[in-house]
UniProtKB/Swiss-Prot annotation:
Annotated protein name in UniProt: Glideosome-associated protein 50
Protein family membership: Belongs to the metallophosphoesterase superfamily. Purple acid phosphatase family.
This protein's GO CC annotations: endoplasmic reticulum; endoplasmic reticulum membrane; glideosome; inner membrane pellicle complex; plasma membrane
Post-translational events: The N-terminus signal is likely to be cleaved.
Natural source organism: Plasmodium falciparum (isolate 3D7)
Transmembrane segments: 370-390
One of the Pfam families matching this protein, by short name: Metallophos
Keyword match Transmembrane helix: yes
Cytoplasmic topology ranges: 391-396
Primary enzyme class: hydrolase
Function of the protein: Component of the glideosome complex, an inner membrane complex structure involved in parasite gliding motility and host cell invasion. During the asexual blood stage, may play a role in the assembly and anchoring of the glideosome complex to the inner membrane complex. During the sexual stage in the vector mosquito midgut, protects gametocytes against host alternative complement pathway-mediated elimination by interacting with host complement inhibitor factor H.
Alphabetic keyword roster: Cell membrane, Endoplasmic reticulum, Hydrolase, Membrane, Metal-binding, Signal, Transmembrane, Transmembrane helix
EC code(s) of this entry: 3.1.3.2
Length: 396
């Protein structure tokens, strides 16, 4: 079987690290959300997930959050072994690869700091270079990576730019992965300085990405658009979406809703992959821009190439690909790879942010409550005016 040979390099530039994979074909990664629930669905999904990881020659995994449906109590919580290490291990080591993840709504209900601490101590600085340590006892399951509540990961891969390598040579494509915490970005997040820094860092990340990356993928828990039970987030649609559109983001990968879906809007695909261990049906009305929706337990496999991005939705109920979505590569006028190192220098430092323990999260963002309240007030005024008009006519 022919497969891609990869070489893993990491360089440390001034205040941040950049990880580079040199891949002599397409770049493949998988996405899996809301996976940490002790169910038959998780076991079945993990079975097919490991098969596809091996057969598709996936390079790394991204998780949009809600890793542990009931959260974790700490670093010694049995959930780490029972719901992660044992479930996603593979004897031959095929599953040992980076597992990039962020916190989701349900993770914040437990000891969220433990999940951050689990991802520390991975990056070792030696003479200005950063490397990922390979633990002797961690070769059979994915390597947990979460250096901060939000962070970025830049990579590149090489493809043939034409049918004849001799005539046309190779073409280098860059991909930027930006991981966000949608709760930290929420207006309801109690620590405003951290909230503001997360937004400022995101703007800087997107500003750099659109200058050096052919592909931009943003990963976060809550969907912006959804036909699932959340119906998406009006707050993210108002504040986050314009930033993503301005940067010409290709994919926004989310979880939160326990289903699989793709909604395409202005050349950006909104991918929901939140059925890693359980599933729920769609809400009463399907989003008008939804191209595909499934309540099956499953996951996604993504392939980046010279032509664009192909996303395969895999159903573990059926054990096969049930939908394939294709997004053409964009010709971004903002690209300036000649000055890539200069742009890299503008990236924010990736370091662990100290977030104190806090109380339960609010059920709704302040934005939603305020807009809803205004709507009720307007409605009340209309009803009052209508009633007054009716009484006035009948009193004459």
């Amino acid at each position: 079987m022919n497969y891609c040979k990869t070489t893993f390099h990491i360089f440390f530039f001034v205040l941040f690290f950049i990880t580079i994979y040199e891949i002599k074909c397409q770049l493949r990664f998988a996405s899996l959300g809301d996976w940490g629930k002790d169910t038959k669905g998780q076991i079945l999904n993990a079975k097919y997930f490991k098969q596809f990881i091996k057969n598709e020659r996936v390079t790394f995994i991204v998780s949009p959050g809600s890793n542990f449906i009931d959260g974790v109590k700490g670093l010694n919580d049995p959930a780490w072994k029972n719901l992660y290490e044992d479930v996603y291990s593979e004897e031959k080591g095929d599953m040992y690869m980076p597992f990039f993840t962020v916190l989701g709504t349900r993770d914040w209900t437990g000891n969220y700091n433990a999940q951050l601490l689990k991802g520390q101590g991975i990056y070792i600085e030696k003479n200005g270079e950063t490397s990922i340590e390979k633990d002797a006892d961690a070769t059979n399951y994915p390597k947990w990576i979460m250096p901060n509540y939000w962070y970025h990961y830049f990579t590149h891969f090489t493809v043939s730019s034409g049918p004849s390598i001799v005539k046309t040579g190779h073409k280098d494509l860059a991909a930027a992965f930006i991981f966000i915490d949608t709760w930290v970005l929420s207006s309801n997040f109690p620590y405003k300085k951290i909230h503001e820094k997360a937004w400022n860092d995101l703007k800087s990340q997107l500003s750099v990405a659109k200058k050096i990356a052919d592909f931009i993928i943003v990963v976060g828990d809550q969907p912006i658009y959804s036909s699932g039970y959340s119906r998406g987030s009006s707050y993210l649609a108002y504040y986050l979406l314009p930033l993503l559109k301005d940067a010409e983001v290709d994919l926004y990968i989310s979880g939160h809703d326990n289903n699989m879906e793709v909604i395409e809007d202005n050349d950006m695909a909104h991918i929901t992959c939140g059925s890693g261990s359980m599933s729920q049906g769609k809400s009463g009305m399907k989003n008008s821009k939804s191209l595909f929706f499934s309540s099956d337990i499953g996951f996604c496999v993504h392939e980046l190439s010279n032509n664009g991005i192909v996303t395969k939705f895999v159903s573990s109920k059926k054990g096969e690909v049930i939908y394939t979505h294709k997004l053409n590569i964009k010709k971004k006028k903002t690209l300036d790879k000649v000055n890539a190192l200069q742009h890299f220098a503008a990236l924010p430092n990736v370091e662990l942010t100290d977030v104190p323990s806090s109380g339960p999260m609010g059920n709704k963002d302040t934005f939603v409550r305020v807009v809803g309240t205004i709507g009720i007030l307007i409605g009340s005024v209309i009803v009052f005016i209508g009633a007054s008009s009716f009484l006035s006519k009948n009193m004459k």
